[in-house]
Amino acid sequence: SGNTSLDLENMFLRVGVQAKAVLDPHFQAQVASLLTVNDLVIIFSLSGKTKDTYDSLKIAKKNGAKIIAITNYIHSPIGKSADLVLQTAIEEFLNGGSLAGKISQLYICDLLVHGYEQNNNIDSVELREKVLRSIIDKSIE
């Protein structure tokens, strides 16, 4: 789930949104403590029961941040505490970290980013080209 949050951070960057993926649980709690009603947190937890993630969610919620949870289990502690749950449908625990779980999360991330683009009339082609130009000549001949 942590790697998927990094992917979502990059996806949002390409449409002009400066998002931050925070993987370290202690840093998550610190960041959550500074959030406000103007902030949105997107939480990834296939089980919906990850303690560190849940603890940070509670801190963020206490500060008024809106919470979107991407999880398999809408009735899990994380699912119940979120303002919105986007449900995946993968039995992740069978092999702990399956590609299917990541793909399920990435699909939801793609929908979130495209929804953001549509709702905010974002010219994503122009922004993506701008980002691409920033890295196009990074190879050494």
How would you label these PLM feature ranges?
Residues 122-141:
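A short, charged, Gly/Pro-tolerant segment at domain boundaries
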